[in-house]
Amino acid sequence: MRNLKITIALFSLMLWVACGENVDTTERMSNYVMLTAKGETSFTEDVAEGIEVNAMMAYRMDKDVSVRLRIEGDDKNAVKTDKDTLVFKAGTKTASFRVLSNQKSLLAVQEVIRVVIDSCSDPKMTPFGNGVNITVKPNAEIPPLTDEQLKLIAGYKDQLGIDLTRMMGVSNCTVTIKFGNDDKEAWNEGKDTRTFIGKSIITLSDKATAETPVLKMVGNPMGMGSYIYEVFRKVTTEDKDFFMQMPVSAAVLQAVAYDYPKETFNVTLDGITLNRDGTLNFTSQMEDEYGDEVTKIPFDYKFSAWERMKKMAAEGKTVEVDEGGTTAEYALSDLLQQIGTLNPTYYLGNSNIATDAYGNEPSNYVTPMGKVDFKAGVMEFVFPWDFGAGGFLSDYINIHVVYTMHP
């Protein structure tokens, strides 16, 4: 997280220094070029639109310039960019391209690829940062409905007059995240909101009854799967100034043989209950990182490194932690619920969302709300959320998700 702040601050400083109107572009400092993903940072092979990536130079140039792009880590040749060379027209400092699937269904397991700037057309131009990491996953699998589920769905149509199949399978959504005033600089490049298009896989929950329809999002719930993984990494393995400086964190990562490109992170959301008035219940009473009962969005996380940590803890494994020149041995079972753990729930969605736990003025808190409108063909959610176990955000982030139903 602190590295993220430093990176943004450095690039902002370069922009400020480079923007003096009285300085000739032929005499200016190095023109740094940075790549950032717009919205989601993961997609499945069957998604045609891929991921949009923005490129920004520190200052405008008085002629057309370009950068050549290179993809690293794509061992299966599963993706491509829509442009090999990205052109910045004279007088502009932004351009964009897309990372696209080759639509060949080549992956059996996910891969993490990186798009970097390979070369620049002008000697003043210099790549800034490490490029953009994008996770490419195998084609999404839609769970088949059982005979019992089909019977329930038919019953809802007859008795309630609703067709649940309009919101099941792969459903498109638009996600808008609003950041608090004190958080937008560090977490959203100074912008108030971040909007992206997502897709979720939705099915009928095992909790559904003949009287009450209940949905389960089994893939990319709320369109936020890759965003959740992004912020989880930023407050753990990508936080070089705190998490990664803790000896216990280093010991745990070594013990579980953490390897980012090979790790998987999946999220589901069960218990979305449709009421007869069209409202949706989707919150639940859960424990926070301190063991207190609070209201949360019951996202369920499956993180491969955390699964290994739990297994090793159950087997009685220990780790050796360097404590200032001396070595101490700890049971992994004692580290499952403290800072340094790889448990996603320790860092994600920490605060109570039934009331405003931050108490800021103005506040970014919003009362959780869900509703469905079959006439308009939309399903909508609004809720507050946070991350970082209280050490990173100054307020909630405010999330608004709108699903478009099938015809």
Regions found by a protein language model. Give the residues of each.
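Intrinsically disordered, low-complexity regions enriched in Ser/Pro/Gly/Gln/His and often acidic
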Residues: 9-12, 299
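C-terminal motif of bacterial Sec signal peptides marking the signal peptidase cleavage site
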Residues: 15-18
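Acidic/polar, low-complexity intrinsically disordered N-terminal segments immediately downstream
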Residues: 20-177, 181, 401-407
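Positively charged n-region of N-terminal signal peptides that target proteins for export
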Residues: 1-6, 10
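Ser/Thr/Gly/Pro-rich, low-complexity flexible regions
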Residues: 144-407
